Regions:
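Interhelical loop and helix-boundary elements at the membrane-water interface
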Residues: 1-28, 36-272
Length: 272
């Protein structure tokens, strides 16, 4: 709970701490014995702490994002085991590696820098929810499916963005195929789609280390790609802001509310 409190911002710990305790209470005093949970906690804490510190050192995670990621990793392993940790670690590591290998020098305004707590939760919240539902319902097979599907969606979306930005050229509107500026949500490219497919196959393949091959493998791939496409569709609704200066070499719109310390004017879309 201390880790959760430290990773909460703007007083949100007043809500997050009791919510997290409420979620953990049934496990600490219910189906999973306290000894079992404590044993798993001690097993995984050094590993995820090392991973978090290395990620912080490489600037993949902010300080608060590191605490959140460590908390997430400990919780996933304590309640589910390695099958609920390895895929999401693969997602974070592959995303960071691709971001560095495929970075471009183009003037594209996108959200960069170390992942903060909200980004960690955005990517890890759905997998955690799948695990919690599985433990509550005592149906871990469906929990594993939901977990791998949600991680595949996040990986698919991340790989799609990285491959699309590096190799895709001008993206197309996902619905009417009109040209869009690079870096704005809602655009698709063929390399980006191939990246999405690759990300899904990557996570589904990791699942093979824990489960025998079956129809679930193809289902995870489809779910992952579908999640990436859905994200692009929702991206069309995301707020876009007018940049104060633009030209043929620089975009005119961004999804950032602020640019060089100046609050930008929203021209379309919805604020999330």
């Amino acid at each position: 709970l201390t880790l959760i409190e430290n990773s909460s911002a703007n007083g949100s710990d007043n809500l997050s701490v009791p919510l997290v305790f409420g979620v953990l209470f049934p496990f600490l005093f219910g189906p999973l014995s306290r000894i079992e949970v404590a044993s798993r906690f001690l097993e995984v804490l050094p590993f995820v702490t090392l991973f978090g510190l290395l990620s912080f050192r490489s600037k993949s995670l902010s300080s608060s994002g590191t605490i959140t990621a460590i908390s997430l990793g400990v919780l996933l392993y304590s309640l589910g085991g390695w099958i609920f940790v390895v895929p999401i670690l693969a997602f974070f590591i592959s995303g960071s590696v691709l971001s560095r290998l495929l970075q471009t020098n183009e003037q594209v305004l996108e959200k960069t820098g170390a992942r903060d707590p909200l980004q960690v939760i955005a990517n890890g919240g759905a997998p955690l929810l799948a695990l919690l539902l599985g433990v509550f319902s005592s149906n871990m097979d469906w929990a594993i499916m939901g977990f791998l599907g949600s991680v595949a969606s996040a990986t698919s979306d991340t790989w799609s963005t990285e491959w699309g930005m590096r190799f895709g050229g001008a993206p197309r509107h996902i619905l009417n195929l009109s040209r869009l500026e690079k870096g704005l949500s809602g655009g698709v490219t063929l390399p980006g789609f191939m990246g999405a497919l690759g990300g899904s196959v990557f996570i589904a393949s990791i699942g093979l280390f824990f489960m025998s091959f079956g129809n679930w493998f193809w289902a995870i791939i489809v779910i992952g790609v579908f999640g990436s496409v859905t994200d692009s569709l929702l991206g069309l609704l995301q707020a876009k802001y007018q940049l104060p200066e633009s030209n043929d070499q620089a975009p005119s719109l961004t999804e950032k509310k602020e640019w060089n310390g100046v609050q930008l004017k929203k021209v379309k879309g919805l604020k999330w």
